[in-house]
């Protein structure tokens, strides 16, 4: 693997690392193939960078502090020779925003093309479907939960307005699992949900409404085919839209007993709710 020394953050070869604004990275084309514009994303920290290297996403480059070359040597030796590894003195790396997070290990990955929905729905499942979630912490936590609870089976599908799993914060909170858990956007929303039924997948909409059933009760009746289930979760504030609810086969909730004072929480954080429901279904 070619080690490329750099001595300044102004070096044009490391332009990807100068601005870590996610929207700018999303619009950035490959200088070697501008026509194939898909944008890039940033991986921060050793754990996330290692997961990127083992994921289906292509690595464009790495940037390491000089002190991190030896600890990363095993990974560097496995990289294709076309992936440059830029190495900079500590004072240069310190100028990159978020040093306390990346600790001198960064990488740029290339976004893939759109996934085929039919191929994804043919996967084993279960499926987690997110409508308009905008909090990157929650997105990252949901991907981490899916990796922990669903193993290799879970697929995540996103409405067009759901936050980007490859944004730096989402990716960081997911511990890099957003690179490993299969996911795609459903551009025709919510009409795409009708394709679940055609694929034999039962859609369960999570909502605390009176017409919903405890997810554990519903899960008990699905023991023969737990993988052919899609768990539909809505935005942090308003929950699922009326249109999304109308496509569901059933509405489910997480029953919460009263606390010591007799008060009952009206809802759970969406990432926590996803984890509890997935655990019940699996």
Regions found by a protein language model. Give the residues of each.
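RNA substrate-binding interface of SAM-dependent RNA methyltransferases
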Residues: 3-7, 47, 54, 85-86, ...
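Short glycine-rich anion-binding loops that position phosphate/pyrophosphate groups of nucleotides
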Residues: 46, 67-68, 92, 112, ...
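Short, acidic/turn-prone active-site loops that include or flank metal/cofactor-
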Residues: 67-69, 90-92, 161-162, 186, ...
């Amino acid at each position: 693997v070619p080690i490329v020394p750099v001595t300044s953050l102004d070096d044009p070869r490391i332009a990807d690392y100068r601005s870590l604004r996610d929207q700018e990275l999303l619009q950035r084309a490959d200088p070697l193939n501008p026509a194939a514009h898909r944008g890039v994303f940033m991986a921060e920290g050793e754990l996330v960078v290692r997961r990127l290297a083992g994921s289906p996403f292509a690595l464009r480059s790495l940037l390491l502090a000089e002190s991190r070359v030896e600890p990363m040597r095993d990974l560097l030796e496995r990289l294709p020779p076309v992936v440059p590894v830029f190495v900079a003195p500590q004072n240069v790396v310190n100028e990159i925003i978020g040093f306390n997070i990346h600790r001198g290990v960064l990488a740029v990955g290339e976004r893939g093309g759109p996934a085929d929905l039919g191929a994804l729905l043919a996967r084993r499942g279960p499926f987690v479907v997110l409508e308009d979630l905008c909090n990157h912490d929650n997105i990252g936590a949901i991907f981490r939960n899916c990796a922990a609870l669903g193993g290799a089976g879970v697929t995540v599908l996103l409405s067009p307005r759901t936050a980007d799993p490859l944004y730096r914060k989402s990716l960081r909170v997911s511990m890099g699992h957003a690179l490993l858990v299969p996911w795609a956007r459903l551009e025709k929303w919510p009409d795409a949900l009708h394709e679940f039924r055609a694929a034999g997948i039962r859609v369960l909409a999570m909502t605390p409404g009176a017409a919903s059933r405890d997810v554990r009760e519903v899960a008990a009746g699905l023991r023969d085919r737990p993988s052919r289930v899609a768990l539909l979760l809505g935005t942090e504030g308003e929950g699922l839209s009326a249109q999304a609810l109308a496509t569901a086969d059933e509405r489910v909730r997480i029953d919460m007993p009263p606390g010591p004072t007799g008060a009952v929480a009206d809802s759970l954080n969406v990432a926590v709710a996803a984890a509890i429901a997935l655990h019940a279904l699996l």
